[in-house]
UniProtKB/Swiss-Prot annotation:
Lineage: Bacteria, Bacillati, Cyanobacteriota, Cyanophyceae, Synechococcales
Sequence positions that bind iminosuccinate: H41, S58, Y129, I130, N131, S146, H215, P216, E217, T232
Single GO molecular function: metal ion binding
One GO CC term on file: cytosol
Record-stated family: Belongs to the quinolinate synthase family. Type 2 subfamily.
GO BP term, pick one: 'de novo' NAD biosynthetic process from L-aspartate
Known role: Catalyzes the condensation of iminoaspartate with dihydroxyacetone phosphate to form quinolinate.
Protein name: Quinolinate synthase
UniProt EC number: 2.5.1.72
Details of cofactor binding: Binds 1 [4Fe-4S] cluster per subunit.
Organism of origin: Prochlorococcus marinus (strain MIT 9303)
Keywords on record: 4Fe-4S, Cytoplasm, Iron, Iron-sulfur, Metal-binding, Pyridine nucleotide biosynthesis, Transferase
Binding site for [4Fe-4S] cluster: C103, C189, C282
Pathway noted in the entry: Cofactor biosynthesis; NAD(+) biosynthesis; quinolinate from iminoaspartate: step 1/1
Amino acid sequence: MVRMTAVCTAKTVSPVPSTRKEFKGAIAELRKKLNAVILAHYYQDPEIQDIADFIGDSLELSRRAASTNADVIVFCGVHFMAETAKILSPEKIVLLPDLEAGCSLADDCPADEFAAFRDKHPDHIVVSYINCTAAVKAQSDLICTSSNAVALVSQLPKDRPILFAPDQNLGRWVQKQSGRELTIWPGRCMVHETFSEEALLKLKMMHPEAKVIAHPECLERLLELADYVGSTSKLLEYTETNPGTKFIVLTEPGILHQMKQRMPNKEFMDVPGIDGCSCNECPYMRLNTLEKLWRCLSTMKPSIEIEEGVRQKALIPIQRMLNMKEKQEASQH
């Protein structure tokens, strides 16, 4: 069982800053005083990204969490990411500015239901996308991210069947790219499933020269319309190296902040959700704010706590992922 508790180690709370500038200054002071590191996912609000020490996707941030010398890790993302940081660095204090920052995909795969599903396939290698709870990770043989899933699955023994969870769209894409047959858990991301195909086709008609880039959590019919499919970090890299100057981006629009910062002379367009709604923004990612970031550093809460037995079991497949990735990178040099 995973416990997410609010642990208070500070006796007093400083006066609440009144402006964004004051919040940023107070956060910088607390970060230095506490020897804290602020990790932010690409889907965070721009003002959170701008104050972070490191910005990245799930794989990059898990590596940072494993290697940091900081005493306190503040994870500006969602709770499965903060859990991963705690799994990798149990001796450190891991803070999440808002405990309500969950994940529809992780919620789509309850640990007890996953255990029953896994028991029906006892001979399968269990590969779980990092977007799942610590309790599901603890039941897995290997963890992957969207940036390394195809490479890792391709390395698995050919004579062993594979169970993949929890994202069905990513699973189908990995199956297609790797050529491996997967038994796939039927989970989905509420954001990546809402992109409007009609809106995408209209944008393509209006900007025929634009490259369409998509995250593999999108629906298959949208991926088929893309010029490039990859994780958030891979999408960012593609826009930097591709000579094109216009890009239609099928993922959470928080990534556009980094794209525009790095390539101010290029144009980036996000795709609206079905019926033109603004649901292409992840409501959970956007729960973290400057005030909540300041408050969690001021009070040292909410903090993430994981039952040690669960943590140790969850660490094994995460470490296996990191080791396989290191071996793969070493073989390429």
